[in-house]
Amino acid sequence: VFKNFVESASNGRVGVEIFMGTQLCGNGAECLEGVAEGSIDVYITTSGGAAGIMPFVQVLDLPYLMADDRVAEAVLTGDFTRKMRNMGLEATDGALRLMTIGNTGGWRNFANTRRRVQSPSDMEGLKIRTVVADLPQELVRALGASPTPIPWPELFTSFQTGVVEGSKNGITDIMGMKFPDAGLQYVTLDGHAYMGALWFMNNNNFLGMPDDLRRVVVDGFSQLQQATFASPKRKSIEAYAAFVEGGGDLYVPSPAEKAMFAAAAGPVQDWFTGNVDGGEEILSALKDAVSAAEADLATAYAADLN
């Protein structure tokens, strides 16, 4: 999407070459370093992938702050992303420019091999796979489960052997990795975190372009963002259907049950603001953006439903 738009809208003045996997860099940290140095122009990562350089981006992983896609998309297309961009530029001495935040795979939900999870008490004692980052481990502990960092490639076998009994992933990842074949049969659609995709560009390379080409690039990232908003929705519908057809148990919490999860996870916000530089500032910006988005949607619903 980005390549086609930018190359056509610039009449070929801007070319886009796409390098997959480790063609340009060995891991996420190395890739971001390459962008900061200017040897790589653009790189996509997750909040966890960027947290080593700018820990405050983990605000996107804080649970139960955005209710649904409409809220999330309104937030991420507005001033909140600009706020995060400015904080990122400051944290990297003007090197890394956040161009947009899209979506990588829908929403994170809790899934496990043992039982249906309807309330936080059902999480008690479950061994939940997390990444090594602190924030997701704090969330799992807050809900009464045991965080167990396991490398992604080892997760299938870890489900089979019982080393872990659950995870916090999107349904497309669950089905793509065939985790139900390893015993993952219970998914609770709590939607605790939006799976953000963060696109960074070398700031000097961007600012060194003429105004008209900068506009083309900005518009290209807007087109890319919209495409990433749409694709996971379609893929998720197909993945949910396949999960249920395969015998999986798919549970949708009631509003009251979801409120119980949010209340139990409340201490994670306290941990974030107390332990992450810029945490209080970026969390306040996110909450303000969510409140504004919810108010706009409430007005729209009032008009559309009556």
Cite the ranges covered by each PLM segment:
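N-terminal secretory/targeting leader peptides
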Residues: 1-71, 89-306
